[in-house]
Amino acid sequence: MTKRIRLGVNIDHVATIRNARGGIHPDPVRAAQLAAHAGADGITTHLREDRRHISDDDLINLEKGITLPLNLEMAATEEMLEIALQHRPHAVCLVPEKREEQTTEGGLDAAGQIDSLKPIVAKLLAAGIRVSLFIEPDETQIRAAKALNAPVIELHTGHYANSVNEELAAELIRIEQAAKLAKSLNIEVHAGHGLTYENVIPIAALEEIAELNIGHFLIGEAIFIGLEASIKRMRYLMDAARAEDKVDFLVKHIAL
């Protein structure tokens, strides 16, 4: 039987909406609790150096207010390392970060930063925190992750999400080959960035991928159909992608 794929829901943009006017509404913790009820397997949040959405207080409140595993995305800096070691989330995903970017634009250059990343990864692992690296689906980067003893990688699916036709097919093959390589090296494979109802099934169908992290699309879709419905439909599509008899699955389940 094909193993169920996990869904991590990123709640950053609940905080983005809150911060547009200030105050406390909408509450990221409440969103995380609703995500759990809707079928999420974990909660992901990115504490940026400029605190443009999630704040330090949000991180504290999430620790207290949720029961799902918390995956903290962060830059590989001493400040963020100190915060991670203080809070000890279930997992930390190291990501590249530029102050001028609207969102994460690409994968971490693990191969070019081995010397600086190695002590950060080692300290996080020593604290019992699962470490992942957000990287491009590239052999050099995957082998660098292995050299850093990172137990998990998250493959950047942004280029796939922005592609069409032949380029889309090529990006999917690239992701599949990267996932197979990582699994052969005993690295757990996650994926995320730009995934939607329209493009998630081919990625979720890749058996080597254990988890997808999805945020912006789910929060945007929630404006129209509600957060729980938004997440439940994504969960449904991911399950459909992993069903051994996809036709039978679709017949037995009512599409949301």
UniProtKB/Swiss-Prot annotation:
SS bond list: none
Active site: 46, 73, 193
CDD domains: PNPsynthase
Record keyword Cytoplasm present: yes
Protein residues bound to 3-amino-2-oxopropyl phosphate: 10, 21, 194, 215-216
E.C. no: 2.6.99.2
Name the UniProt record assigns to this protein: Pyridoxine 5'-phosphate synthase
Native species: Zymomonas mobilis subsp. mobilis (strain ATCC 31821 / ZM4 / CP4)
Lineage of origin: Bacteria, Pseudomonadati, Pseudomonadota, Alphaproteobacteria, Sphingomonadales
